[in-house]
Amino acid sequence: MSFETPDFSLALPEIWLLAATCGVLVVDLFSSDPRRSATFYLTQGALLVTAVLALSTQWGVNEVTFSGHYMADSLGAVVKASVALLSVLALAYTRPYLGDRGLLQGEFYLLALFANLGMLVIASGGSLLSLYLGLELLSLALYALVAYHRDSRQAAEAAMKYFVLGSLASGILLYGMSMVYGATASLELSVIAEVAGRHSDPLMLLFGVVFMLVGVAFKLGAAPFHAWVPDVYQGAPTPVTLFLSTAPKVAAVALFMRLLVDGLGPMHEQLEPMLMILAVASLLVGNLIAIVQTNFKRMLAYSAIAHAGFIMVGFTAGTDAGHAAALFYTIAYSIMAAGAFGMITVLARSGFEAEEIADLRGLNERHPVYAGVLLLVLVSMTGIPGTVGFYAKYLVLQAAVEAGHIPLAIFAVVAAVVGAFYYLRVLKVVYFDRPEAEVDADTLPAPGASSAIRSLVVVNGVAVLVLGIFPERLIALCQAALGL
């Protein structure tokens, strides 16, 4: 019997983040600072180092270790770096909000670190086992984060819904994995792909793939498995919603790629009709229901469902170009979502959450910088030419057309036009509606945090603007990660 010695150097990002999380836990345990400065800066530093390690140790590599359970490649490197950097951006918005409400505890940052560890494991998952373990580590941390505000009935209700539906989706995914294992006699994605190409025991394999697709679609928030998204986005504390709408989206796309592309790519022909249904349903449900929303967070939740539909359009193409477009779309959307939800955290104060669209009345008169950033973000989400959102939609649609899915591409364009209505409605409120006196007093930035937050808002807006003017670097990075 031969024993393969694992190459621990390939798993350096995960090893570092686990060690750093333990270090942050110890430091926070002995910290008496109510602002948790050491915990915050150590968390941000750990995530930045993780991004550097991911790109430096795994870019251009294509190796499998830990008996096939761990895969080090360029796709994993890009996903890990994106997840870590998006988490840094999301967590930077949270500190004033949490401090203003007496919620600034070390547990928030520790849960975010454990969630990142789960996302890193997903990004390099080389088997069904490692992917499921990474997913559960991520999910458990997110369940706890949604319930982080213990005194909020809304947060408790959202957490319960998320936990129950998430557990059901995880069970369905696990059942699908068990059927795939039964049909292929292996947990390794490379072996599963080889067997799937030969169509061994196709009926059991196909049923397993359907269950797995349902589980992954739930994690991505695609219709008709989207029931948790509006309630969780609205009920969770805004910093948690901000985090939930950024890095975990990239991890969900990575899970999709590992399971249904690396593992079950040869079965794309059978998957194609199901992927198309998910894309159409998400575009339809997300855009139509978002139109009637008055709560800004809930509107953005349905917007996220619609964006998941565009991501599914990229996967429906079934080509490397389509997969690269889906990855680029997810990263671009996450940056835009950080700006949108970040704006809510900036404008909110204790006793006033700034969650209603009406709360944004006359924002341009009170805070023109914030209004300008929100304009950039929402115009980009709409997909106006010259923005990063336009390039994201263009690449996805191009991949769909090249794959012969012209009716699907036309439907996606029509859905995007419909979706423009609710984004422009918010901008109309921001720029043309008069502010109410009582709202004007409440929506000032949190005391002592205005300069730091203003800088962060500007950085987020500049990132959206620069990626819209110069998208080539990020597009090339995503394409190189897929071997293009």
From Swiss-Prot:
Main subcellular location of this protein, as a coarse class: membrane
Superkingdom, natural source: Bacteria
Keyword annotations from UniProtKB, A to Z: Cell inner membrane, Cell membrane, Membrane, NAD, Quinone, Translocase, Transmembrane, Transmembrane helix, Transport, Ubiquinone
Bilayer topology: Multi-pass membrane protein
GO cellular component: plasma membrane
Membrane-spanning ranges: 10-30, 40-60, 74-94, 108-128, 129-149, 163-183, 203-223, 237-257, 272-292, 299-319, 327-347, 370-390, 404-424
InterPro entries noted in UniProt: NADH-Q_OxRdtase_suN/2, ND/Mrp_TM
Signal peptide span: none
NCBIfam families per record: NDH_I_N, PRK05777.1-5
Family: Belongs to the complex I subunit 2 family.
Protein name per UniProt: NADH-quinone oxidoreductase subunit N
Organism field: Halorhodospira halophila (strain DSM 244 / SL1) (Ectothiorhodospira halophila (strain DSM 244 / SL1))
Lineage per the UniProt record: Bacteria, Pseudomonadati, Pseudomonadota, Gammaproteobacteria, Chromatiales
